[in-house]
């Protein structure tokens, strides 16, 4: 592959991740962009010193994370857990469990008074949980997705993922 075609492919991937509504992006590119966004928000939350900013960041995290996890469970984890390989079933079940823990921690964080020791502790735990989850998902689940689904199927998964996100209401 030439340098020019490599740059064109990289540009297409980045543009697709930035404008996922086009629906012709691999699900993994969309998930990568969303993981990066949430991890950035969590980093900012754990560094924030003001209650106002912390409250705003928690809301932004909820708006990003709740639809992401629900749609990901429907479009990625359910098909992975349905595969015949035991490792795939375990990886899928682990993803569901980590999503449940993240959701519970996020709801706890949302109920706490910002800029208190309890709030800061919950924010730190949520960040650590998401960091761990993303690392494992990107290593294990994504390998399963690449191994078991064609590029066309992954593009369809992306369209399904984006549609599923629109159906999720954020509390």
For each predicted feature, which ranges?
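Small-residue-biased structural context
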Residues: 1-171
